[in-house]
Amino acid sequence: MNLSIFLFLIGILGFILNRKNIILMIIAIEIMLLAVTLLVLISSFGFDDNVGQTFSLYIISIAGAESVIGLSILVAFYRLFLVLNYL
């Protein structure tokens, strides 16, 4: 549980400190989502519940789809403006 909280705080810190780099912001969001997934998995193993393990698979698949959408928007932004920093 402490590891997932630590990872979530690293993700928040990375999101706040890298406001000018969109790729690092997407990576920080992915770290936060994986920290939540780790917490769900730890809780499901602790309570002997298979629903939490299934829910963690959904979280991972949604996080993957979110990163694909974010990176495709980033590629479209780069093709229009030829720069990745938005400030």
UniProtKB/Swiss-Prot annotation:
It is found in: Mitochondrion inner membrane. GO terms for molecular function: NADH dehydrogenase (ubiquinone) activity. InterPro entries: NADH_UbQ_OxRdtase_chain4L/K (IPR001133), NUOK/Mnh_C1-like (IPR039428). The chain crosses the membrane at residues 1-21, 22-42, 57-77. It comes from the Eukaryota. It catalyses: a ubiquinone + NADH + 5 H(+)(in) = a ubiquinol + NAD(+) + 4 H(+)(out). One of its GO terms (cellular component) is NADH dehydrogenase complex. It is a multi-pass membrane protein. Its EC number is 7.1.1.2. GO terms for biological process: ATP synthesis coupled electron transport. Its main location: mitochondrion. Keywords: Electron transport, Membrane, Mitochondrion, Mitochondrion inner membrane, NAD, Respiratory chain, Translocase, Transmembrane, Transmembrane helix, Transport, Ubiquinone. PANTHER family: NADH-UBIQUINONE OXIDOREDUCTASE CHAIN 4L (PTHR11434:SF16), NADH-UBIQUINONE OXIDOREDUCTASE SUBUNIT ND4L (PTHR11434). Core subunit of respiratory chain NADH dehydrogenase (Complex I) which is composed of 45 different subunits. Core subunit of the mitochondrial membrane respiratory chain NADH dehydrogenase (Complex I) which catalyzes electron transfer from NADH through the respiratory chain, using ubiquinone as an electron acceptor. Belongs to the complex I subunit 4L family. This is NADH-ubiquinone oxidoreductase chain 4L. It comes from Moniliophthora perniciosa (strain FA553 / isolate CP02).
